[in-house]
Structures are given as C-alpha cells and as structure tokens.
Curated annotation (Swiss-Prot):
Family to which this protein belongs: Belongs to the phosphatidylethanolamine-binding protein family.
Protein name per UniProt: Protein CENTRORADIALIS
Origin species: Antirrhinum majus
Domain of life: Eukaryota
Gene Ontology process terms (BP): cell differentiation; flower development; negative regulation of flower development; vegetative to reproductive phase transition of meristem
Subunit structure: May form homodimers in solution.
Length: 181
C-alpha cells in the first residue's frame, strides 16, 4: 500500500520538520506587506522579492478574543543558504502579547523586525503564531543575543508556548540589479 502524501504546503515546504513539529492550525493569521505603495499578502510557498518586504508587515490574528494573547515569530531556516543552512535559524522578528482579533501593532515587539536579505538560493521566511497561556508569558528566557542559530523549538519549549496555532511562509531570493529598477 502506498504511503499517503500530504498536500499541506507547510509539509511540502518543509516548514513542518525543519522549524516546527506537526500541528493543527486553530487560528487564522494574515500577513500583509505594504512596501513602495504595493500591498502584498503572504501565501504559503509564494515568492516575494526583497524589495517588497522591506517594511514591517501587518500580521492580523483572526481568532481568540481580546483576553487571548499570542506570540509571533518570524524566522529564516535557510541561512546562509538552503543547501547548507549551518546557521539555522535566523531570527527576523518576535512580537509577544498580541491580543486575539487584533494585529501585531497591538503587541510588544521584543526583537525588532529585520527585513529579509537572502544571499544564496531561495530562502523560506516563516511566520509562526503561538497562543500564550497568559499575558507576559513569552519573556525571552534566555534573552536573544544573536539572531543566527535561533531555535524555534527550543524557544517555545523554554517559554512554554507549545505548538503553533497558525503558520505561513513565503519564498524569497536575491534580486538582480535589473529587477530592482
């Protein structure tokens, strides 16, 4: 009998496996970039150019209620390149205490947004949303001192965040000078 092949884009894109363990999405999350007067929505596996993701995105949480709080992590598991990601993962952003039914601007930015700058190959940029047990739960224990070598699994375990409740990723690669014009 043939093994069942998953059609989940997070499995196909190896986000589940490389970054987090298998989970069931229970909250809807939207990630929207507004760079250079161009609005780009993030969909699993779609490609966005670095010039389209320069500014901090708006991440909307469509679930929970105002008494629920969420932690958002953005990471790149393909550093310095996808064929040899020995610096895996590179942390791009952490926002904690995001109230349900709001967006990331209502949370507490504990690691500032760093725009994607892929140098070698196609990188995956992953947004993960975790439900907190209470406000102020994710206190960066221990504090992040280096963005390279970040480990989402270890961070969520140390801060008792459990598995994600939502995730989305996009692909991004270095733009040629001709493309940026």
């Amino acid at each position: 009998m043939a093994a069942k092949v998953s059609s989940d884009p997070l499995v196909i894109g190896r986000v589940i496996g490389d970054v987090v363990d298998h989970f069931t999405s229970t909250v809807k999350m939207s990630v929207i970039y507004n760079s250079n007067n161009s609005i780009k929505h993030v969909y699993n596996g779609h490609e966005l150019f670095p010039s389209a993701v320069t500014s901090t995105p708006r991440v909307e949480v469509h679930g929970g209620d105002m008494r629920s709080f969420f932690t958002l992590i953005m990471t790149d598991p393909d550093v310095p390149g996808p064929s040899d990601p020995y610096l895996r993962e590179h942390l791009h952003w952490i926002v904690t205490d995001i109230p349900g039914t709001t967006d990331s601007s209502f949370g507490k930015e504990v690691v500032s947004y760093e725009m994607p700058r892929p140098n070698i190959g196609i990188h995956r940029f992953v947004f993960l949303l975790f439900k907190q047990k209470k406000r102020g739960q994710a206190m960066l224990s221990p504090p992040v001192v280096c963005r390279d070598g970040f480990n989402t699994r270890k961070f969520t375990q140390e801060n008792e965040l459990g598995l994600p409740v939502a995730a989305v990723f996009f692909n991004c690669q270095r733009e040629t000078a001709a493309r940026r014009r």
